[in-house]
Amino acid sequence: MSAESECPKRMEFGPCGGVRPDGQCEMRRGACIFESAVPWSGIQPAPQPVRAPLVLTDFSCTPFDRNDVAATAAILAPGCDAVLVGEHQNKPDFPPTLMGSLLLDAGVTPWVTLSCRDRNRVVLEQELRGLRSIGVETVLCVTGDGRGYDVRPDVTQTFDLDGPRLVSLAASVGVVAAVPETPTAPPLAARPIRLVEKQRAGASLAVLNHVPSPGMIGEFMEAAIAAGLSIPVIAAVAVFTDNVSAAVLQGLPGLELDETVTEQVLGADDPVAAGIGAAVSEAHALLKIDGVAGINVSGLASASGPHIGAEIKAEVGRRIRAEAS
């Protein structure tokens, strides 16, 4: 097989969520090699019966700072049921097991993202067993974004496994495997089916990436349920209150914001209040969709610093929980 016909992430069960809007690969020139979702061919365990958090809030703090982990967790805790720890290609932090331990000590329930980008299978197994041993129940299993060309070019990218195979590994060691899906990434018709294939691999929960409108999530969920989806789904709400926090979201692979809402928030007399209100309104609409069991409060939220952003996301979470009670 030629290099042009191989996935640079060595994926077997693609396509990943980083496919560009024009169908191009995120890591090299040329189209993604996957024209449709590859059916899962491995063991098909029954999904673990789990309850999705109503509010799952993105967690971001100063890297490698134990004190800031605790401080940020204290801000977020009153407005969420769990926190989602990302793993960004340009922002390394403590190893997953250590981060999970710090967050448990801080009194929050962590969902830890585990990526195949920087770990071979042995290290992935170590992290999964380590997380399970300290009491972290849920791991978001991702293939991982490709590292930017100017981000540590001296470091290799591993990709021993892809997301679905990591899901299978996680389920085999007793970890609750959560998975992402990007409804707006090509090929669009394959995305609901690919989520079902992840369920067959052992996923028990799903987190959907941002889309421009709740109606798009409704269409996605209808197609996914028709294809056999039965696991709880958490839909993302974009939280932004200034140009920088909006731009960060729009710069992520496969992520789109509603242009009208973005203009209304950024042009408001009080962008913070407008951003919070827009996020809560979107969450309310998403929770009415069949199969959506929770909300991922996501985004930088503010360019004024991580603690200000955490306070904004905590307020969004508090309002979502108050309206749902």
What are these regions (language model features)?
Residues 1-45:
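Cysteine-cluster motifs in flexible loop/terminal segments that predominantly coordinate metals
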Residues 5, 86-88, 116, 180, ...:
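Glycine- and other small-residue-rich loops at beta-strand/loop junctions that grip anionic moieties
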Residues 66-67, 89-103, 119-127, 145-169, ...:
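Active-site-adjacent beta->alpha loops and helix N-cap segments on the catalytic face
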Residues 53-60, 81-85, 110-114, 139-141, ...:
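Hydrophobic faces of well-ordered beta-strands that scaffold small-molecule active sites
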Residues 62-76, 96, 121-129, 187-197, ...:
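Short, acidic/polar
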Residues 45-82, 93:
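Conserved N-terminal beta1-alpha1 strand-loop-helix module at the mouth
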Residues 61-63, 144, 154-184, 226-282, ...:
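Active-site pocket-lining/capping segments in soluble small-molecule metabolic enzymes
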Residues 49, 73-78, 97-109, 128-136, ...:
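Acidic (Asp/Glu)-rich catalytic clusters
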